[in-house]
């Protein structure tokens, strides 16, 4: 854990961001702006090709920012590359079902895809909007079934996305960020990570509090 924390503070950690939409792409830009190397993952070939060509498909994210980010960022559809990153942020959609519950199918599919490629001492954070209990019920078992002990040799956090797309008054950098972790160590790492790119983090006592 100490090595992971220092590598984040020294901008040596490689950040993997899964889901390159209106939540994931601004995070790509912020981590790049602060000096991190970033790998973006998406199942959409067209999005990946556009980003690697320096093109933006999100109205409020200017093309110049994408072109500039290519100095330290690339996008891929190859999820086996998860084993090459230190931090994994899951930013996939969780649209509401007819019963007004978040549909977790994209999260579940992502976890199934990346499970074989997880490695020791990674930090995995869910950003997708969801209901209390999701991180413990969906993410922790996947990590444990891959052979890791959460809080000891693999770390899990939750930080709800707080994007306000296109609002010039608020940006990824300035909107306060709620952060939580499965354990004290997990919270410490999650807070240290976002502290690199967000002006104000708000650590809370548990995953469920952050998910509310």
Regions found by a protein language model. Name each.
Residues 90-92, 128, 182:
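Glycine-rich, N-terminal phosphate-binding loop of Rossmann-like dinucleotide-binding domains
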Residues 141-157, 163, 168-212:
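Internal alpha-helical scaffold of NAD(P)-dependent oxidoreductase catalytic cores
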Residues 24-25:
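N-terminal Rossmann-fold NAD(P) dinucleotide-binding loop
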Residues 96-162:
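Rossmann-like NAD(P)(H) cofactor-binding subdomain of soluble oxidoreductases
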Residues 83-84, 120, 174:
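Alpha-helix C-terminal capping/helix-to-coil transition sites in glycosyltransferase folds
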Residues 2-14, 33, 37-39, 43-87, ...:
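Conserved N-terminal Rossmann-fold NAD(P) cofactor-binding segment
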Residues 20-21:
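Glycine-rich Rossmann-fold phosphate-binding loop(s) that bind the pyrophosphate
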């Amino acid at each position: 854990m100490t090595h992971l924390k220092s590598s984040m503070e020294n901008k040596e950690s490689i950040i993997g961001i899964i889901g390159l939409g209106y939540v994931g792409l601004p995070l790509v830009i912020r981590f790049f702006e602060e000096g991190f190397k970033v790998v973006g993952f998406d199942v959409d070939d067209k999005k990946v090709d556009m980003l690697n060509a320096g093109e933006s498909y999100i109205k409020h994210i200017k093309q110049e920012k994408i072109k500039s980010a290519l100095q330290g960022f690339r996008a891929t559809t190859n999820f086996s590359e998860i084993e090459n990153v230190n931090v994994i942020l899951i930013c996939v959609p969780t649209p509401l079902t007819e019963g007004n519950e978040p549909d977790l199918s994209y999260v579940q599919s992502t976890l199934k895809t990346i499970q074989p490629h997880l490695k020791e001492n990674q930090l995995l954070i869910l950003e997708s909007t969801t209901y209390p209990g999701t991180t413990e019920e969906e993410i922790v078992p996947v990590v444990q079934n891959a052979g890791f002990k959460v809080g000891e040799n693999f770390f899990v956090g939750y930080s709800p996305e707080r994007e306000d797309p296109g609002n010039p008054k608020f940006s990824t950098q300035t909107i306060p960020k709620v952060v939580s972790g499965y354990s004290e160590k997990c919270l410490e790492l999650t807070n240290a990570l976002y502290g690199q790119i967000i002006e104000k983090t708000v650590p809370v006592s548990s995953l469920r509090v952050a998910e509310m």
